[in-house]
């Protein structure tokens, strides 16, 4: 918003350096806020709190003190660029921008940043799938409204030529650039192994599979790039109004990617699918990982995944194919569904190093926390399983069967 208040915090750097708590205190002192409680939902390393102004206005306060070595997307530069992306969309795509929660304050400190938005009483996009056996239809009603807004009011307002090597640089390269962070944190025998077995399936290390896939990437490149409508459309970045009479169109967006460059809408579609298949269940349920000499790695969730998620995953691609808002968009982009599956698998792999910068507790349904390294390991192993299956199917049939591919993370996981 052009009328947002941008201030510099004047608090002195603490002797031991900035912590989340010290930065929050600086924000509340600067803005005169009273903190009610921490909001633990969300997947980024930023800490989020509900707070109140002296005038009684409810706000959400997001504070980021980046961890050393944080990957792109979890660093301070990305945090600050998110605000610039929202600002751009208010001019470029005002109908979509109306769905973004407005930024009320921006506070920059010495090596940290914070922002505030109005507090929005809400649930995440996937909440209907957890709450009711009938929630699958409600989810798709809501998701159809979201896709319509993102595509028709957002992505479609611009069209740009796709540069050569786009998929290799943006989709595959995102994981490869983060791989050194993962190698420094996970067991050396795993990260140096060229071959491993995951859930009974012999696999190659992901970077080797991606080398073999390099020659196929141009075949699934986007026909065009479009406006930077979001770029991180996971289910927790879409807030559904908690009002009982809320319509499907009553949602708010938060936390875009932090880029004003042209973008591929398939990236966001794949991010939502990834949220349902691996990311959100992992954060809510935790991973169970076992290893033996005979069977290799066995990875699944600690408890069975939500039935609504499984149903939505298997309906996801058929639903997208039937969406009117997408039919025209991808009419001359025959590789979009195969690109979506590739991007989904790379989201799983690229998320592994992200989880290492977790700052908030991640309790499962029984209250047991998941350590950052546990979440990183689970994502890496399931991503390894998926990318190997994708490469096998492409080599055997020239295309990927979505049902059998996604069944690897919905129907065939060992129980915790």
Q: For each predicted feature, which ranges?
A:
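Juxta-kinase regulatory segment immediately upstream of eukaryotic protein kinase catalytic domains
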Residues: 2-38
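ATP-binding glycine-rich phosphate-binding loop
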Residues: 26-56
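Active-site acidic catalytic loop and adjacent metal/ATP-binding pocket
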Residues: 44-53, 211-265
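ATP-binding glycine-rich loop module of kinase domains
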Residues: 45-83, 127-132
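Conserved kinase catalytic-core helix
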Residues: 88-94, 123-190, 206-222
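Short beta-strand micro-motifs within the conserved protein kinase catalytic domain, predominantly
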Residues: 99-113
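Active-site activation/catalytic loop segments of kinase-like enzymes and analogous catalytic loops
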Residues: 250, 257-326, 345-363
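ATP/Mg2+ or Mg2+-diphosphate-binding catalytic cores
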Residues: 304-416
